[in-house]
């Protein structure tokens, strides 16, 4: 890039750099954002379709989970990646609503594009969008429905709503019960860490055969076949070390002149190992999990005492075992006491999906649990896992916040109506941006209708009519196209899913709108600059960006499919 300075050109950027400015830059970025939103739009709602994603190695993923789709698409365009970050933030914060947030973000950009063509400045749009978002969150807070932590029925409805439209939908009755029981088990005064709910996938059987284990499954086997296969009324020791003779930290040489001396060394090692096992026995342990190895001789003594032992357990398994059973890990087995032991009704080695694993179950008030998910194929089980993770997230958020909203496009329709009224009180051109924000929110009920095969205009008119008459919880029944009361039908989702979606979508849209200059360094040009392909300029993206930054023409593999 060069600029004139007098009669001499002033070189500012390298020859490989590419720059797009003004309306071209805005148009390119808006197009990228809209393309991302369009790629997941058909997955929204209970009648949403799935996507098949195939990576460079031939691995196949079949899903309609928004964030999974966007991650697997390997998008390179920087503006498009801002929209992907919206989905990732939504997934991290609340676990569901990723598609909603992305679709709203894309529609905000689409509405903004129309206003930009009418010479409304981008900063005016950004300011209006922010005002509308703040008002929307305020209105949502006022309309939220309170729910208590022990309202299991409502929590199950929330979990089921998160599974609707996914591969687990047919078994959502069974799975929602498992999810709620799991989250309630690990909750500490409404503070929930879903890491304490471990998910184990098993290929084979029906989804309905999935189960909740009140305890921990350790992906290990007992260290010796001579040990008991199962132990009832287990007293569990967690040894944060191995049952082995410790090596010295310094190199030493010992000259052995007599075979008896060698035997004395071996006897001494054996005695140390026996003392370790005796310490466990005296403490009352009949199950041992060791962080490191277990010597063969120690295995012999453990088996002789009827103690079931597992070696090289993972650190996260130790954490779960400690939380589930109440055991306290000890670093020196010789210091173990009865108070350090945890308790479980049963510890047994069982076959699960062709693999032998250790089941620690029947734990009283377990604070760490395991969900065993089953499905006919690997793809089915993977999709069930994604649905379960979403459900765990929304139940966690509901327990933490205690507030929910009706689903089915009801809150978006109500917000759109109230924001249009609010726009009348907003001065200047920001009023147009607030109205555009209201229009953008209606993309949710409109898309729900489209994906279900209903007329989106008729559905939206019916929804507006119901809300205008004061039915604020009226939403679209995607199965038959009727407008129904979402709360009474049990179609609800956490308040934070909606507020986070609006917040993230607005931030991403305003950030993209404020960009009026895009400069791509040579190494971001997708390898096209300088390529001897016979073209005088880079191909692909609008606004002259070419292959730079992934190129809108390619979108990192999205291409013309959108």
Curated annotation (Swiss-Prot):
Q: Which residues form a coiled coil?
A: none
SUPFAM superfamilies the record matches: GroEL apical domain-like, GroEL equatorial domain-like, GroEL-intermediate domain like
Concerning PROSITE patterns, the annotation shows: TCP1_1, TCP1_2, TCP1_3
> Residue ranges under compositional bias (Gly residues)?
537-551
Q: Which GO terms describe its biological process?
A: protein folding
Q: Name one GO molecular function term.
A: ATP hydrolysis activity
Span list, region Disordered: 1-23, 526-551
- Keywords assigned by UniProt, alphabetized: ATP-binding, Chaperone, Nucleotide-binding
Q: What does this protein do?
A: Molecular chaperone; binds unfolded polypeptides in vitro, and has a weak ATPase activity.
* Subunit comment: Forms an oligomeric complex of eight-membered rings.
Question: What protein family does this chain belong to?
Answer: Belongs to the TCP-1 chaperonin family.
What name does this protein carry?
Answer: Thermosome subunit alpha
Its taxonomic placement starts with: Archaea, Methanobacteriati, Methanobacteriota, Stenosarchaea group, Halobacteria
């Amino acid at each position: 890039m060069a600029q004139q300075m007098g009669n001499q050109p002033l070189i500012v950027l390298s020859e490989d750099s590419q720059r797009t400015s003004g309306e071209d830059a805005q148009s390119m970025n808006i197009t990228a954002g809209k393309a991302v939103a369009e790629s997941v739009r058909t997955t929204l709602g209970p009648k949403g379709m799935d996507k098949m994603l195939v990576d460079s190695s031939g691995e196949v993923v079949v899903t309609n989970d928004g964030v999974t789709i966007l991650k697997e698409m390997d998008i390179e365009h920087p503006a498009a990646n801002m929209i992907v970050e919206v989905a990732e933030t939504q997934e991290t914060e609340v676990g569901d609503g990723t598609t909603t947030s992305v679709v709203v973000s894309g529609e905000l950009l689409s509405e903004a594009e129309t206003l930009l063509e009418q010479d409304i400045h981008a900063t005016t749009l950004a300011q209006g969008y922010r005002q509308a978002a703040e008002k929307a969150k305020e209105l949502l807070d006022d309309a939220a429905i309170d729910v208590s932590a022990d309202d299991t029925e409502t929590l199950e409805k929330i979990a089921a709503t998160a599974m609707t439209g996914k591969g687990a939908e047919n078994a959502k009755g069974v799975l929602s019960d498992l999810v709620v029981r799991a989250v309630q088990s690990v909750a500490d005064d409404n503070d929930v860490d879903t890491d304490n709910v471990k998910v184990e996938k098993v290929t084979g059987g029906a989804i309905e055969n999935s189960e909740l284990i009140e305890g921990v499954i350790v992906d290990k086997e007992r260290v010796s076949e001579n040990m008991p296969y199962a132990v009832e009324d287990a007293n569990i020791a967690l040894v944060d070390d191995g049952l082995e003779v410790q090596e010295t930290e310094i190199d030493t040489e010992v000259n052995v002149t007599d075979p008896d001396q060698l035997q004395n060394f071996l006897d001494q090692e054996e005695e140390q190992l026996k003392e370790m096992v005796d310490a466990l026995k005296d403490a009352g342990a009949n199950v041992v999990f060791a962080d490191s190895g277990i010597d063969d001789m120690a295995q012999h003594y453990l088996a002789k005492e009827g103690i079931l032992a597992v070696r090289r357990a993972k650190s996260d398994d130790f954490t779960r075992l400690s939380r589930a059973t109440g055991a306290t890990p000890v670093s020196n087995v010789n210091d173990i006491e009865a108070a350090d032991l945890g308790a479980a009704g049963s510890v047994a080695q069982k076959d699960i999906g062709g693999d032998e694993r250790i089941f620690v179950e029947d734990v009283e008030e377990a604070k760490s649990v395991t969900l065993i998910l089953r499905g006919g194929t690997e793809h089915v089980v993977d999709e069930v896992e994604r649905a379960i993770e979403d459900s765990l997230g929304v139940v966690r958020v509901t327990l933490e916040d205690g507030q929910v909203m009706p689903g089915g496009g009801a809150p978006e329709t109500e917000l759109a109506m109230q924001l249009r009224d609010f726009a009348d009180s907003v001065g200047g051109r920001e009023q147009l941006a607030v109205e555009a924000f209201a229009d953008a929110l209606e993309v949710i009920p409109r898309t729900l209708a489209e994906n279900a095969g209903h007329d989106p205009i008729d559905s939206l008119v019916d929804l507006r009519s119901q809300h205008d008459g004061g039915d604020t919880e009226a939403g679209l029944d995607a199965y038959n196209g009727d407008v129904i009361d979402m709360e009474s039908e049990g179609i609800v989702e956490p308040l934070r899913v909606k507020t986070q979606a609006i917040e993230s979508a607005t931030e991403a849209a305003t950030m993209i709108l404020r960009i009026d200059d895009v400069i791509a360094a040579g190494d971001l040009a997708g390898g096209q600059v300088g390529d001897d392909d016979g073209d005088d300029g880079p191909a692909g993206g609008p606004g002259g960006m070419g292959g730079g930054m992934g190129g809108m023409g390619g979108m990192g593999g999205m291409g013309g499919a959108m």
